[in-house]
């Protein structure tokens, strides 16, 4: 039986098992050592209000304790790197003073703004002014918070023991009770000193504890050691003025009964004015408001100087040395809401046909013809069929109502805004006659010219999505837009509101597509004009039908296939030495092998325009084919082959060197031989074996431009553009229009600020928005980056504008103050986090035309009813000079926040741990 016993499975009792408390201590100790809490390098004094303006770094670790675990957070202020001032360095002579002691005694960080502008600032930093501290709390504090005294003692004792073991100089707090109460208990250790932190709250405090006299008595009772010097006090009182509302009613372009006037809200009505019409809404929601607080501060007083009790108080606004006004704005703009709503379209993957049905363009020669390239081979006399379809399209198809929430009259009004020339009876906003490039820098934002067709369309789509039918209304407008484009093409009319010239790849893709459509219309009109001009000059005896066919051959390019494009017919072969297609002579240059003949510049085909996506597709194809592929050479040299064939037709006796002299003069180099004679020869890249130029020259035959195959088929390219626009899905339409939309929104806001004469006040914010949009528009990623940060900045600027209008009214403009005075003080609000100084007796006396003079009538009234809180801080610091034994007694700190009958006490009392 004994032989069957396995020693490995034999049970052994572990007598060294640790308790939960010891395990927790070990885990917490490892975390504190990793954070290096025993060092105290940052011992310089804090600047005034530095705690409230600096950035914070928060590190988190999780421990498996108390059901769902305990989270340990290390909060640390990121201070500017500055060397200690000499006078300050001399002051720091006691090794027992830590940064925690300095922070508790710092009067410059006693009171922060009454409005929490940043959620990152922890309440312990606001109450005690600490630059770094550690907090322990349950992982889900709202569900599993600490309730019992045993839990408090468990963690607080662990914190005290671990702090002593690792020699931590950072205060450590434990959050207790419900998190919304903000109750903490904590401890901070220093050599021979221990500071105990306690936070409590009373719903109804004793009357004597709501004033300074009673609080001083309570403070003296809590101080563990007797101090000979007087305590220093800091006091802050906060008053709330009436909430200010300014109604800026909603304005929606092409408003059909939309208005916010049915919501009755008290407040002054102020309509926003703009110089340039933009199809985007503006105004602010009725619930927008600005809350105004007056904060008076007594930064540092001796306890024997001031008196404060139920009977009499010295802490009244008229006696305050420092007074500030804070403006808390909650404003929501219809413009920002419209842009945020438009973001949702990025997630809509439905096709346009699912909203408006198939064949919404109203003609059968649309997307279907372009989408089936086999028709070009199987159909006979395709060119003539196209010519017949280019005449007036079917009016029944074009006037067919598009499905959607808008009526025909409403849709016609929107189309009149986009195409004013096509609806002269309804056009209210014609396009500017001056050059579109005057107001737009394409090197910056990859958008379109302001108030161009692209910008108007983008704004209309966003407005329709927000106010005129959601996604269905947006799809209806886009379908009507593409149908109008097809109507313009079928009638050989230029698209209005688009920059002239080839597709500019510095602009957005939608603008490039419309530029391409205009180029196609221009080429088509030019080609048809040339054909008509030649047909009128023809004299012959052939029948009318034969004359028409012959005119087509002379006036238009042949749609021949690639194999026979260069050769032509036998009667037009390169063997003929009759020059054709000459444009003009190249100065007095002569052919190298025929000095008696001049060198002529041939009539060549115009360059082939391409949009950005086409260039990208070509690059991808050539990358896949590789550099050695013949197709790659053919793609790159199509235009070169056409020019060489035209040159040979114009100069039958010319050689490649003659062509290079005209086409690429830099490759015709001047050299000096051994005898000192100057000669010319081709460059090295032209004479390299297997040179592409030589191959193409050998392949090229003498074919004038009139008989060459067209490099650019304007008909096919126009149908491609129309097909592209008609087959976009909703999220693709969003990607095409979001950058011009944001660009127009920023310019609209700049226009509003300019009309209010505030462009100088907010110029830096506008410039930042444009710079951010520039980076966003030129992102190289396949997916558009998130526009949320830009929308947040835009909404913040709109809130600032609403805040200024309220501050302008508060300042008594225009009767009691000038606009320049209001702007000067509002600049301080922008710099100081919604705060403006109205009283500063340290620097100047009150008055002198400041906001204080305007608020005097309000201050002379009884302000007691407007008092919302009183904040008292009592400090007592014992240095080595105040005790007989030369011991540092440490800081004593108590803060009392009185709000009506409620009282919150926050104490930090230091005791000695040395045995004397």
Curated annotation (Swiss-Prot):
Mainly resides where?
cytoplasm
Q: Which GO terms describe its molecular function?
A: GTPase activator activity; small GTPase binding
| GO biological process, alphabetically ordered | establishment of protein localization to endoplasmic reticulum membrane; excitatory postsynaptic potential; lipid droplet organization; macroautophagy; positive regulation of autophagosome assembly; positive regulation of endoplasmic reticulum tubular network organization; positive regulation of glutamate neurotransmitter secretion in response to membrane depolarization; positive regulation of GTPase activity
Sorted alphabetically, the Gene Ontology cellular component annotations on this record are: cytoplasm; endoplasmic reticulum tubular network; postsynapse; protein-containing complex
Which top-level group of life is the source organism from?
Answer: Eukaryota
Q: Which InterPro entries match?
A: Rab3GAP1, Rab3GAP1_conserved
What Pfam families does its record include? Answer: Rab3-GTPase_cat
Region Disordered, annotated ranges: 530-574
The compartments listed are: Cytoplasm
Sorted keywords for this record are: Cytoplasm, GTPase activation, Phosphoprotein
Q: Which residues carry this modification: Phosphoserine?
A: 543-544
Q: Where is the composition biased (Acidic residues)?
A: 545-562
Where are its TM segments located? none
| Protein family (similarity comment) | Belongs to the Rab3-GAP catalytic subunit family.
**Role of this protein:** Catalytic subunit of the Rab3 GTPase-activating (Rab3GAP) complex composed of Rab3-GAP and Rab3GAP1, which has both GTPase-activating protein (GAP) activity towards Rab3, and guanine nucleotide exchange factor (GEF) activity towards Rab18. As part of the Rab3GAP complex, required for the rapid induction and sustained expression of synaptic homeostasis at the neuromuscular junction (NMJ). Also participates in the regulation of autophagy in tissues such as larval fat cells and adult muscles. The Rab3GAP complex, acts as a GAP for Rab3 by converting active Rab3-GTP to the inactive form Rab3-GDP.
Subunit info here reads: The Rab3 GTPase-activating complex is a heterodimer composed of Rab3GAP1 and Rab3-GAP.
Q: What is this protein called?
A: Rab3 GTPase-activating protein catalytic subunit
Organism in which the protein naturally occurs: Drosophila melanogaster
UniProt gene name = Rab3GAP1
